């Protein structure tokens, strides 16, 4: 039995609140249970130096956690003067995941930055950031389309979403909360497109290596979960 009472293949309640920020071209407050992340997409009419005069645009991401997003207050990374390794790893993952479904040539020489700020953390902040970040990116592109800058269906090739899976109490489970994640025997993150393409898989065993059979079970849970998340994304943007 999972501490939350959920079934092994049951995700937490997921919700998207679009246009949460009045200033950003695109924004979304995403909730995976008690994990809440504000994702904003900001458009700039410039590209990184290595892309100048290439005709291509860029999509990148930054990630951070509010000091009291966790049980005890964390010091702001800005106060330390540098980002931690975990932060850099996560924001690169978010950027890679979103670029996987964007035609950078069709975007033109512009940059969209996704800022993913964790308001409350209870496990799965990176997967929530990717899934909610796609909504914010979509709304930013719709904003651009309304100003005759691009066509959304030419720039955005597919949905992308992410979910965590792991082995907890010797059982493969989906969408681990913090209590499960902190004591899981295996922890994995899956990023996939709406068409089922694999963007990234991160998997780590804690102490005991996991078997190919266990990995196959986790992969099956992830595919079903991401299918549900993509359906929720479609429902959110249709509203």
Swiss-Prot record:
EC number from the UniProt entry: 2.7.7.56
Pfam families named in the record: RNase_PH (PF01138), RNase_PH_C (PF03725)
Gene Ontology process terms (BP): rRNA catabolic process; rRNA processing; tRNA processing
Keyword annotations from UniProtKB, A to Z: Nucleotidyltransferase, RNA-binding, rRNA processing, Transferase, tRNA processing, tRNA-binding
Class of enzymatic activity (EC top level): transferase
Chain positions recorded as phosphate binding sites: 86, 124-126
PROSITE patterns: RIBONUCLEASE_PH (PS01277)
Keyword Nucleotidyltransferase included in the entry's annotation: yes
Catalysed transformations (reactions): tRNA(n+1) + phosphate = tRNA(n) + a ribonucleoside 5'-diphosphate
Classification via SUPFAM superfamilies: Ribonuclease PH domain 2-like, Ribosomal protein S5 domain 2-like
Keyword rRNA processing assigned: yes
GO MF entry, a single one: 3'-5'-RNA exonuclease activity
Membership in a protein family: Belongs to the RNase PH family.
PANTHER family in UniProt: EXOSOME COMPLEX COMPONENT (PTHR11953), EXOSOME COMPLEX COMPONENT RRP41 (PTHR11953:SF0)
Subunit: Homohexameric ring arranged as a trimer of dimers.
Function: Phosphorolytic 3'-5' exoribonuclease that plays an important role in tRNA 3'-end maturation. Removes nucleotide residues following the 3'-CCA terminus of tRNAs; can also add nucleotides to the ends of RNA molecules by using nucleoside diphosphates as substrates, but this may not be physiologically important. Probably plays a role in initiation of 16S rRNA degradation (leading to ribosome degradation) during starvation.
Protein name: Ribonuclease PH
